[in-house]
Amino acid sequence: MSAIKKIHAREVLDSRGNPTVQVEVYTELKGYGSAMVPSGASTGSREALELRDKGSKFESNWFGGKGVMQAVENVNKLIAPALIGFEVTDQRQVDLAMKALDGTKNKEKLGANAILGVSLAVARAAANELDLPLYKYLGGFNAHKLPLPMLNVINGGEHASNTLDFQEFMVMPVGAKSFREALQMANFVFHNLAKLLKKHGHGVQVGDEGGFAPNFKSHEEALDFLVEAIKLSGYKPATSGEKAVAIAMDCASSELYKDGKYTFGKLKKAIEEKQPGFENLGKTKLVYTTDELIDYLDHLVSKYPIVSIEDGLAESDWAGFEKLTKRLGHKLQVVGDDLTVTNTELLAKAIERKAMNSILIKVNQIGSLTETFEAIQMAQMANMTAVVSHRSGETEDTTIADVAVAMNTGQIKTGSMSRTDRIAKYNRLLAIEEELSKASTFPKDVFYNLKK
């Protein structure tokens, strides 16, 4: 093995055309790794800090405060000198050294985007030097499980300019026997959904994550279209069984929460403005208490084949999450995203309070590969499922695909069947499945922690 010889960062663009950080790492024995950092739109308030240029000497640059040149400078002038000479395979020591150099709880000094870019690039450089695929370098010989994909085929919330308040409506091909088959099933549903939308006069424009973004009059309407698309594709809308396709939702309820109530603000605006088709919806319920929203979610679960609900309540509504998990946690995934932000301190609290039974894993929420792995391992030890996830602002970087296989998480959420920034991850997983061949497995019981 060899030492880190050079680290260089630059400003590049993500899938929304916003600046993000790219980092390259070079080793003494010609190992090379490059990584790009994703960015979220609906973010948890306790996430590690993504450093932008607003308020810095770079604010007047061409991105008007949204740039990341301060983070880039922090890599090139502060992090790089501190890490030159480190053994490239000492990932944990590298990550801990950056954490110490930053010295803050949420990485606000150097920026989580600066630290994460280096962390991921170091791992890639080590894998490159060893001539190993990244998943095998990270997970060793036991990295073998391909993940069941959650495909976000209808976008709403902060990810689309439409009337849907819940952020993501996803399909999960639970009846597939391989990753390739799962992707094929999802592809059929996606394209048949497009046909249905066109047939009923809806546009097929897409949101940030590649899903369609129609102006539906309710969440039920979105779910009805999904069920019909599944049937039209020749599959069964169900939570289990052969050729079954289930539904998952990300409510992103923190975005709906204010003064102790949940408001469907986008739908409310469409009704108040009397947008075409919304003129006669004045009696629609738009404001919910915690208990009422739990009742509403329970109603949806009883009516549709929903197997996973992410951020069903706001990040500060811990008591509500406890109630939701007690009510529905025996039959579906109650996924914490904003609630726990890939943070082991918050995850430990959620485990103690039984506030969820599944965690969403986003590498940029915590800001290093080491801390990401710690969160996955803590969840698995607590009999929770872990869902490796993209962000709405993505790049062609495919690291999360390798992470999902390396840690045998069994689930991945990385967008729809459009936009290259999403498809790149699926293509990477297809290549991994082919490379592993007979050594690969595909989860037969992905929801292993649910009581049968």
Swiss-Prot record:
UniProt cofactor note: Binds a second Mg(2+) ion via substrate during catalysis.
Active site per UniProt: E209 (proton donor), K362 (proton acceptor)
Subcellular location: Cytoplasm; Secreted; Cell surface
One Gene Ontology MF term: phosphopyruvate hydratase activity
Catalysed conversion reaction: (2R)-2-phosphoglycerate = phosphoenolpyruvate + H2O
Signal peptide interval: none
Keywords: Cytoplasm, Glycolysis, Lyase, Magnesium, Metal-binding, Secreted
EC code: 4.2.1.11
Residues the entry annotates as binding Mg(2+): D250, E310, D337
Chief place where the protein resides: cytoplasm
Pfam families tied to this protein: Enolase_C, Enolase_N
Cofactor: Mg(2+)
GO biological process: glycolytic process
A GO CC term attached to the entry: extracellular region
SMART domains attached to this UniProt entry: Enolase_C (SM01192), Enolase_N (SM01193)
Recorded family membership: Belongs to the enolase family.
Name of the protein described by the UniProt record: Enolase
The species this protein was found in: Mycoplasmopsis synoviae (strain 53) (Mycoplasma synoviae)
